[in-house]
Amino acid sequence: EGEQLKFTGIPSFAPELLKSVSSTDPMKGKNLEKALIQFAEEGAAKLFKPMIGSGFIVGVVGPLQFEVLASRIKIEYGIPVRFETTQFTSARWISGPLVTLDEFSRVNKGHMAEDNDGDPVFLTRLQWDVERVERDYPDLKLNSVKQMMI
């Protein structure tokens, strides 16, 4: 009695493809952000906001999803978009002691982002990036699956 229960929800898997997204109409940037957040909440894609820069990175499982997203954003929000290749090939949710995580984020700003829930994400270019983190920061954990708590 009186204890707080947490239930595990549906796991969220790291996307296999990452691309930056932008509107071809510069006047619709704010609307694009709303559209991307909506699709991330639906689970249609993962949305990452890099620590550096003003854009977004969208992650999906298959290449056709980019075309579907572009079409839905155009039809439902009236925003023409383009997806472009990024330097990143994977995303990993990162967790660990706050002090270590803060230091890591500061040193690796160019690889850090937040997901739609505000959780820290490490964007990687190569498997070597993951191995380096595991070697240099043993207190941190990189996860390819995010457990959703409800």
Model-identified regions with their sequence ranges:
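Structural and coupling elements of P-loop NTPases
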Residues: E1-I150
